[in-house]
């Protein structure tokens, strides 16, 4: 089961860049992490954070948190779609929010 992208706050047509948080769950597989990073790299982005854990339950489930910052909204959408298409991925939850100027 996959989840649609959730936008926090009011959508803004003026948002040049966004922050995207992806929470992925899948059965443990040694080749999963490279398959999750590949679509990000192909789109020219570098993750701000990647954290993988199999600490909960019996260890047969891998949860991965992947964060992107400073990416175009379209890039965040494409990454989300690509993550959902990765073989073995059970669920992808995404939160995308406009970046605030400092």
Question: Where would I find each of the regions flagged by the language model?
Answer:
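A conserved regulatory-domain signal marking ACT and ACT-like small-molecule sensing domains
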Residues: 2-102
């Amino acid at each position: 089961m996959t989840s649609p992208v959730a936008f926090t706050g009011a959508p803004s047509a003026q948002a040049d860049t966004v922050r995207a948080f992806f929470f992925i769950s899948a059965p443990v597989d040694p080749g999963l992490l490279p398959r999750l990073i590949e679509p990000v790299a192909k789109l020219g982005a570098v993750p701000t954070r990647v954290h993988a854990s199999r600490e909960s339950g019996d260890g047969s489930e891998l949860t991965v948190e992947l964060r992107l910052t400073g990416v175009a909204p379209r890039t965040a959408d494409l990454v989300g779609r690509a993550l959902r298409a990765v073989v073995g991925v059970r669920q992808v939850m995404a939160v995308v929010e406009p970046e605030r100027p400092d």
